[in-house]
């Protein structure tokens, strides 16, 4: 129990209900209202990350870095990419070398430190992302042309209605 309390004290800024500097006065609270709203909206995700980080005894930022790529895979309409082949390795690093193709050496080292502890979690999220992408891709392929036609019709009606074919 003491370890969890120490962990929460160490990462109180990320794992707290409110940002650390907004509980001093009403003026601070009102000045930081947009940040507070973002904090409250992201509370379920932060709760999951902090609980997992506490159980695995790793930095919550490490968990967040490792969750973002699989979460992006799980939302194909945001990334507009097909999911890559899953592996149990960190997706961005060459194992053991700490070299990442798209990141500077400091971030590359951080990924490599996170890799061993969270590779199973990456695998699970990646597999879930592939399943979601497989389900959503045909639906999106059907919906996208309809949205394009609707937007085209609205633009046409607003610019020159006499040539829209009505």
From Swiss-Prot:
Q: What's the protein's topology in the membrane?
A: Multi-pass membrane protein
Organism classification, top ranks? Viruses, Viruses incertae sedis, Ampullaviridae, Bottigliavirus, Bottigliavirus ABV
State if Transmembrane is listed as a keyword.
Answer: yes
Q: What are the UniProt keywords, alphabetically?
A: Host membrane, Membrane, Transmembrane, Transmembrane helix
What is the species listed in this Swiss-Prot or TrEMBL entry? Answer: Acidianus bottle-shaped virus (isolate Italy/Pozzuoli) (ABV)
UniProt-recorded name of the protein: Putative transmembrane protein ORF166
Where is the protein found, in the record's own terms? Host membrane
Disulphide bridges in this chain?
Answer: none
**Record keywords: Transmembrane helix included?**
yes
Q: Give the record's GO CC terms.
A: host cell membrane; membrane
Its domain of life reads Viruses
Q: Which residue windows are transmembrane per the record?
A: 35-55, 60-80, 124-144
